[in-house]
Each structure stands twice: as C-alpha cells, then as structure tokens.
A protein has these predicted regions:
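Non-catalytic propeptide/linker segments at domain boundaries
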Residues: 1-23, 33-42
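Chitinase-like catalytic core of GlcNAc-active glycosidases
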Residues: 15-30, 55-168
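Mature extracellular/periplasmic domains of secretome proteins
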Residues: 37-43, 113, 168
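Alpha-helix termination/capping residues and helix-transition junctions
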Residues: 40-46, 118-121
Length: 168
C-alpha cells in the first residue's frame, strides 16, 4: 500500500438536474441573437445550443471564429447553454498535422479556451470528422489536453462521435 489516492474527476454533467438536450446551429457567417431567437421559435426541450463557430483554418492550429457576444447573451437569456462547435471539414487542412505536432495542438487548445472565455461560452463541442487511422493517438492526446483546460476553466467538453463501422 503506497497511500496514493487517485484524484477523482467528476463530470460537470454529474451536477445536472436535467438531461442534456442539445441542438446544433449551422452558421454561414457571424449571426447575432436575433437569428438564434428566430431559429428557436417554437422549439421546446432544448437546453444546449451548439453553434458551428470555430473552424480549423491551417496546419498551425489557428481557428476562424464566427462567435458573437449578442448570440451568447440571447441564448443565456433564453435559458440555453452555449457550447461552441469546432470542426475540421471547412478548410483544406491536415487534421493529422495539427494534432500530431505538440505546438499546433497546444495552439489549437489555447485558441479554443481563449474564445470560450472571451465569449462566455459554457462548453466546447468537438466535431472532428474523417479522422485517419494514423491520427488516432494524436486525437486522443488532443482530447486529453483540451479536457484539462476545460476542467480548469469550468467548461463542458462534448465530443461528437459516430458509431464505428467496418469501413471507419
């Protein structure tokens, strides 16, 4: 017996009183709160909105951001949490290059946390698709590193993933 006690990492979701019901909000540009209000008119049961705001734009881990303060403020006024979505499919980039190099991976994490704090987001939703098999370990390392920073900043980390198939 070494006396070591492993730290506990409870999920932010453990303290929730209600089930998470998230909807994605596809953005074609910067949109303010009026766009959200129109999109949510008549919608019930949703308590988290995930706007497609952050796009990996180069192999150095830089992001293009469509985030908007008014959108977040309106969402919060409507009782919605905002989990900004980051994706890798819009620009001609190499997800493997970004995630396999410590410098670019670290920069990507820093960018995401910076924007999350600047725009007072409640979480980050990761939607990385078409990930090559050789990027698997780098992706897991990225999620580890991002999860540490999210936890330190009281941000929910959500990951979109599909059910694996024989061809994936």
């Amino acid at each position: 017996n070494t006396g070591y006690t492993a730290p506990e990492y409870p999920s932010l979701a453990d303290n929730r009183e209600e089930k998470i019901n998230m909807a994605w909000h596809q953005m074609g540009g910067v949109c303010d709160g009026s766009v959200l209000a129109a999109a949510m008119e008549g919608v019930t049961g949703v308590n988290v909105i995930s706007p497609t705001w952050f796009y990996m734009s180069d192999n150095d881990g830089n992001l293009v951001s469509l985030a908007d303060h008014d959108y977040v403020s309106r969402a919060h006024d409507m009782g919605l949490e905002v989990w900004g979505l980051v994706e890798n499919m819009t620009y001609d980039i190499s997800t493997y290059e970004i995630l396999s190099r410590m410098e670019s991976r670290e920069h990507l994490v820093d960018e995401l946390i910076h924007y999350a704090l600047e725009y007072q987001l409640d979480g980050i939703n990761v939607d990385i698709e078409a990930l090559s098999f050789d990027a698997e370990e780098a992706y897991i390392q990225f999620i580890r590193e991002l999860s540490i920073e999210c936890r330190a900043n009281q941000l929910v980390l959500s990951i979109d993933n599909y059910v694996p198939t024989a061809s994936s």
